[in-house]
């Protein structure tokens, strides 16, 4: 279903109107009036559709039509009425004498709507829109457009090339790399202040050396020997007893060589081991004299069954006859009694 066609299209002319057709239509309407647009073409002797005759008369041939461009005042009225009425172009045309609804609609779609959208996109406020701003923008754009036409055409902005993107990326990464050492220096300077370096800004390696020396001065090593351990540095001397502690840390380089950490040194390991061996041998020999088993104990101390670990602080003995004797500390003469064999 739908509206019936005004007339049959077969044998009718289409396209632009000629001056003769405009003259025939104008004379007929002036003498007979508009009347019915369906029967008007046949009565006037035109091979045109009734709709085509109506649009030609209303939009072009009327005497009360305004010719020329739409003024700024008319633009203001159109914007205000459109905000109130919407797309009701016929009602808007009644407030603009000499302008047709078709002309107003075409002007809105082609000019005003685009300018209003651009203005609201820049300002970000669509409610407080002033028509004067739109009109001023139109005048400014027309003047600037005339100036730009006289100048040479500018290069069109397209997508950025990959080479420029790579250069930008390299510049960004380089700036980040330069900023990182500054942050590290600030961190080390703060760490030096927390470590009682009196606010001196030290490098990373100097800061680590200072921390190592501070840790060496605070660490504790339990000495198990009864003799005094005297360092190479004369300022640091530690005398120890049975369960005394010394402020030193051991890192042995080779067996029988002197070990060094910073400025602290200790006596040779071989010397300590020989002293302990002689002391233990004398102790065992004294006990063997009491039990009349001197030969067996002396042979035990001098035999290869006694194992000395160079890297260990404890001495392990494995005796024959399933008798084992281990000591975590040095032997106390008061606690040792007679040893009985199975």
Curated annotation (Swiss-Prot):
Biotech / industrial applications: Promotes flavonoid biosynthesis in a light-dependent manner when expressed in tobacco (Nicotiana tabacum) through up-regulation of the biosynthetic genes.
GO BP term (any one): response to light stimulus
Keywords: DNA-binding, Nucleus, Transcription, Transcription regulation
InterPro entries for this protein: Homeodomain-like_sf, Myb_dom, Myb_TF_plants, SANT/Myb
Record note on disruption phenotype: Reduced flavonols levels in leaves. The double mutants myb11 myb111 and myb12 myb111 and triple mutant myb11 myb12 myb111 accumulate less flavonols in roots, leaves, stems, inflorescence, and siliques. The triple mutant myb11 myb12 myb111 is impaired in flavonols biosynthesis and exhibits a reduced UV-B tolerance.
Domain HTH myb-type: 9-61, 62-116
Regulation: induction: Triggered by HY5 in response to light and UV-B.
Ranges of compositional bias, category Low complexity: 140-149
DNA-binding region: 37-61, 89-112
Tissue: Expressed in seedlings, cotyledons and young leaves.
GO molecular function, one term: DNA binding
Annotated compartments: Nucleus
Residue segments, region Disordered: 140-169
Gene3D superfamilies, alphabetized: Homeodomain-like (1.10.10.60)
Main location (coarse class): nucleus
Protein name (Swiss-Prot/TrEMBL): Transcription factor MYB111
Classification of source organism: Eukaryota, Viridiplantae, Streptophyta, Embryophyta, Tracheophyta
């Amino acid at each position: 279903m739908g509206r019936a066609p005004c007339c049959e299209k077969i044998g009718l002319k289409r396209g632009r109107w000629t001056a003769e057709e405009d003259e025939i239509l104008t004379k007929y309407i002036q003498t007979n009036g508009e009347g019915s647009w369906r029967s008007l073409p046949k009565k006037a002797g035109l091979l045109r559709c009734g709709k085509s005759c109506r649009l030609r008369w209303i939009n072009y041939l009327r005497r009360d039509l305004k010719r020329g461009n739409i003024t700024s005042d008319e633009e203001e009225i159109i914007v205000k009425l459109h905000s109130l009425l919407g797309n009701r172009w016929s009602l808007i045309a009644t407030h603009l004498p000499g302008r047709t609804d078709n002309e107003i609609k075409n002007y809105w779609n082609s000019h005003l709507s685009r300018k209003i959208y651009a203005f609201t996109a820049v300002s970000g406020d669509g409610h407080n829109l002033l028509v004067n701003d739109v009109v001023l923008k139109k005048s400014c754009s027309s003047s600037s457009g005339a100036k730009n036409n006289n100048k040479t055409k500018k290069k069109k902005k397209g997508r950025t090339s990959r080479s420029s993107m790579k250069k930008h990326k390299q510049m960004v990464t380089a700036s980040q790399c330069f900023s990182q050492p500054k942050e590290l220096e600030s961190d080390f300077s703060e760490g030096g202040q927390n470590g009682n370096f009196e606010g001196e800004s030290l490098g990373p390696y100097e800061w680590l050396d200072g921390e190592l020396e501070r840790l060496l001065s605070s660490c504790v090593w339990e000495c198990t020997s009864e003799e005094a351990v005297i360092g190479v540095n004369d300022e640091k001397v530690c005398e120890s007893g049975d369960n005394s502690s010394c402020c030193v840390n051991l890192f042995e380089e080779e067996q029988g060589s002197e070990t060094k950490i910073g400025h602290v040194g200790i006596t040779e390991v071989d010397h300590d081991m020989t002293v302990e061996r002689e002391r233990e041998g004398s102790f065992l020999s004294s006990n063997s004299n009491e039990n009349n088993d001197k030969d067996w104990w002396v042979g035990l101390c001098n035999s290869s069954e006694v194992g000395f670990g160079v890297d260990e602080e404890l001495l392990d003995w494995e005796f024959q006859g399933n008798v084992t004797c281990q000591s975590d500390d040095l032997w106390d003469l008061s606690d040792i009694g007679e040893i009985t064999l199975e």
